[in-house]
């Protein structure tokens, strides 16, 4: 209904809105070329002669006369039904009525349509039999040209083959476009600079309108060839918020421009004749928008949805948009799922799983008996096989739901007729039952079922939609017993869509429609295979030489529905919901979630202080800085009370700095090689450091000496972690090792027990590791850009994701353990879903990001240039750049309350940062 509201808004603002004519009066794939003011002469030459004033429209397949008086019907004469076309009075016919200056055009035909009499939207009336109509143009000098045009179009309409008809009409259209160009006088400002101009068609539901596209340094223009519905459509580039490349007829020819963030309907949809023209225009607008608008991907929206920052409804709208679904293209209208299974109860129980449809199955597989019949036919079918002959979304299905608010669109689609009364959208329950039991009915729903506008359920236009077999007239849609009104029905449908059950299972439906079960063997296994022509890449129209075959295929593509563009090729992650106590499958991943403090919803994870700190992270200010090392700082750890700061450096020293006295208290050297990281054991009695000399050193703070040395690797140790008496060490020897570290019986004595529990082998050097909150999962980053997620309960590799083009600098789990963030020398910040291993967000900076801390939504990273960058992952943007070090930021520490931050850098400094509240 978004396109209906858009049209109504435009009509309210424009003088031409009083016209009854619209492009919907044309046949599908028909063009409107020109109009002439004229009189329709009735009873020419008799005493009863009278004139009806109006406009004569010349179209590629018909002649349409729109009387000025709404009491008179619009007249549509198909050119294929014309017997003779000529100037009135030629060949002796009615010659004595023809004056020298007559502007008469005579049409003799066998069939005529009468439309919108008294401006009432109703099925077209048809009159058959040989008739002659005479139209007298206001400009007599135009008669000859108009007659010549009509004769040419008549020849095209009478060709035997549909492909030949289309080819000839296309040639006529292209000739007209070639003889015209964009009128530069239509520029908003004389100083505008023209960037490019090309031919295109403006796409609206069921119709296209050819013309010229022009883009300048400030505006995008479209000038229709026929001047309808207005001389020029103008969009200010500064107002553009979103722009998408579109498939049109499975061809890469479409471009859709939005001037709003959330509106379902765009400001203009253009179809180009050449892909290069589309790409050039897209590039120009995208370049203009680059510094004004953040670009969103399916992965970035997924992250927002998982985190609860997008509702299920909003997420589905975004996925539809990214998958080429548009309200301007009814063959690719946004598709939404049936959610509710119960349409018979008096009360709707959203706490009962039985209330809901099984979202893991396509509609065609919900009925077991029907599915068995379909599978039998599928097995017997020659290649290419398909299970369902009709699609889950098509122009017919969209208008089936919207006929009460979009009757003219239905009449356009069905050649001037409404559907049989018993086959119309009469009842929610009947429609659902037919989707379950019908032999060829597998349709899903549209966004309107989860919106706020009830008009598609109510016959507010008082349309005569026919009488059913039982004698009742088709009127408002019959609602289920649990809905007291259309408003109540939509509200409960929205509640169902946003329910916990749907939130926990919506990813299964996304897998079918937008994801990995859409194509290939996974689609076969999910009983989700449709006709090949519905899929992108199913046919190359440019390779088809037979014009009839090409037109037939294009017609099938446009009229029988198209499968959305595939957005995901791996299983879609689940949503994080407050009710998420355990996942349905049993795995170590689930065990880690059960033990994790991230078990609750994301909002429950953060205490008030953490939330306050991250909300003000962009206000970070440099408080104090100290140069305490001779080389780059590599690690920072702080005592629990915050008084002592321990740092490691490439100068091979561990240093202890007093925050209170602001003085260096100790400097310890274990070898002549760099130290790479450090951490404090619980109790603040021992510091552990890793070294490039292949060892891990234990230092007793109380006794001021090296307590123990673990010689466990064959190359430099790059990073260490500790949890629950277990040491995790990463090394350039391509391993991560897990050790048990039994505490010493007496403080200061040596640790004698370092048992190797597991060895996680890699193909290349490991540069960084991190544990999740429960220490059941470990993530490692390698020299060649691979991020690996390990299950520590079984010491097995869960996922290996090659997501960086250089060294992985740092990795960390989100507080709820559901995502991993990684940074690299390639400047990328990548977010990975732990359950599926899917890369769900990737942002890029112009320099390497060496280290970071994050809360799941925002990231504070240290860059190669010395800046601290604040990233908004959900908004996919850099929120703030904060000056700090004079060299690369190499390490960053944040306390548990997120109130204290310390960074170290290649400039040999440690910097204490202050949050401004």
Curated annotation (Swiss-Prot):
BEACH-type PH domain segment(s): 189-286
Segments forming domain GRAM: 176-247
GO cellular component, one term: cytoplasm
Domain BEACH: 290-575
SMART domains: Beach, GRAM, WD40
Gene Ontology biological process terms in this record: ceramide metabolic process; positive regulation of amide metabolic process; positive regulation of lipid metabolic process; regulation of membrane lipid metabolic process; signal transduction; tumor necrosis factor-mediated signaling pathway
Expression tissues: Ubiquitous.
Top-level taxon of the source organism: Eukaryota
Keywords: Repeat, WD repeat
Metal-binding keyword on record: no
InterPro entries: BEACH_dom (IPR000409), BEACH_dom_sf (IPR036372), BEACH_Domain (IPR050865), GRAM (IPR004182), PH-BEACH_dom (IPR023362), PH-like_dom_sf (IPR011993), WD40/YVTN_repeat-like_dom_sf (IPR015943), WD40_repeat_dom_sf (IPR036322)
Swiss-Prot/TrEMBL WD repeat ranges: 628-658, 670-700, 712-740, 761-791, 803-833, 884-914
Keyword presence, Repeat: yes
Role played: Couples the p55 TNF-receptor (TNF-R55 / TNFR1) to neutral sphingomyelinase (N-SMASE). Specifically binds to the N-smase activation domain of TNF-R55. May regulate ceramide production by N-SMASE.
Protein name: Protein FAN
